[in-house]
């Protein structure tokens, strides 16, 4: 999509400051697509500050782990009065793709992504772990990290680049958890991580420089799922944006005995968990390698977020 309201050419020089291979991939996308380099750079940056999501990991009574997410994007970035929808999700739905990353003709990981975007927000290493990233709104947020990067302070990882790096290189749940917990980042985030053994599921709450909390599955005490929207679990969500309570209510009513991917899809289809910002839903089951994504549209009556 075109952002004529911004002079995006000023972002083009920043591409060379990005780590390899992301810088070269962005240049390649610009060359092949014919889009200005600054516009492709912007397309790869603004996910650091505008993503609103719901992610969960759940374990059934047999020890099978499920991981799913709604990706909601484009809050306050333009409302289409005629279609009664946000403009950005309308642009992004046709760009949504499922990718299979291979090395030596062997699948390393799978991801739901947007064409032209080199970072990762949702992915699975089949048989090993699943991973989603949700934005964490904070005063010391993504804007600050990006400004510091522009000014030359570049000692942190871009969130989506870290997610991709973990999907590419981590070979176990424990290794992925360690990298997501300890790597310095440009923006605060929630990483929702699922493994391949009973009890392996957590929400990692991150500031830009530290890990603030790791909320883990705890079956002995009845915690058979973890669920994250965009608020710290020890705080109440904003009353205008409470997706957490309805989602948890649906999960509790479903029960651990009856949890499954179709049941989780139904949970993520419940309003306001499903809303006008929802672009796609991804369902993952690590042991079988099941990886499914669905484009979403919330029919009226439906809340904006």
Model-derived regions, located:
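Short histidine-centered catalytic/ligand-binding loop motif
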Residues: 152, 161-167
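Gly-rich Lys/Arg/Thr-decorated short loops/hinges at beta-loop-alpha junctions or inter-strand turns
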Residues: 6-7, 156-160
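Internal, well-ordered alpha-helical segments in soluble enzyme and binding-protein domains
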Residues: 159-162, 172
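C-terminus-biased signal that marks the final domain/tail of proteins
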Residues: 1-53, 58, 167-305
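A contiguous strand-loop segment
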Residues: 16-158, 186-188, 258, 279, ...
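Short, structured patches in soluble enzyme cores that scaffold and shape functional sites
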Residues: 69-71, 113-114, 133-137, 162, ...
């Amino acid at each position: 999509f075109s952002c004529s309201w911004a002079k995006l050419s000023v972002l083009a020089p920043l591409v060379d400051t990005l780590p390899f291979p992301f810088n070269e991939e962005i240049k390649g996308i610009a060359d092949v697509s014919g889009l200005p380099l600054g516009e492709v750079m912007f397309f790869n940056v603004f996910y650091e500050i505008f993503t609103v999501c719901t992610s969960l990991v759940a374990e059934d009574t047999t020890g099978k782990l499920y991981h799913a997410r709604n990706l909601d994007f484009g809050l306050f970035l333009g409302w289409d009065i005629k279609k009664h929808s946000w403009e950005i999700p309308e642009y992004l739905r046709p760009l949504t793709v499922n990718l299979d990353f291979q090395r030596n003709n062997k699948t390393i990981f799978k991801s739901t992504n947007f064409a032209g975007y080199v970072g990762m927000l949702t992915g699975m290493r089949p048989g090993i772990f699943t991973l989603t990233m949700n934005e964490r709104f904070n005063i010391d947020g993504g804007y600050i990290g990006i400004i510091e990067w522009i000014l030359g302070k570049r000692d942190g990882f871009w969130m989506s680049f870290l997610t991709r790096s973990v999907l590419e290189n981590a070979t176990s749940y424990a290794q992925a958890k360690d990298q997501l917990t300890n790597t310095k980042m440009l923006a605060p985030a929630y990483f929702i991580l699922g493994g391949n053994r009973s009890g392996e599921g957590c929400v990692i709450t991150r500031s830009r420089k530290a890990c603030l909390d790791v909320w883990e599955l705890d079956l002995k005490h009845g915690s058979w799922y973890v669920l994250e929207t965009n608020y710290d679990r020890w705080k109440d969500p904003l009353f205008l944006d409470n997706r957490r309570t309805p989602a948890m209510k649906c999960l509790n009513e479903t029960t651990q005995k009856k949890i499954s991917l179709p049941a989780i899809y139904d949970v993520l289809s419940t309003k306001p968990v499903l809303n006008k910002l929802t672009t796609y839903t991804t369902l993952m089951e690590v042991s079988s390698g099941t990886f499914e994504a669905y484009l979403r549209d919330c029919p009226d009556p439906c809340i904006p977020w």
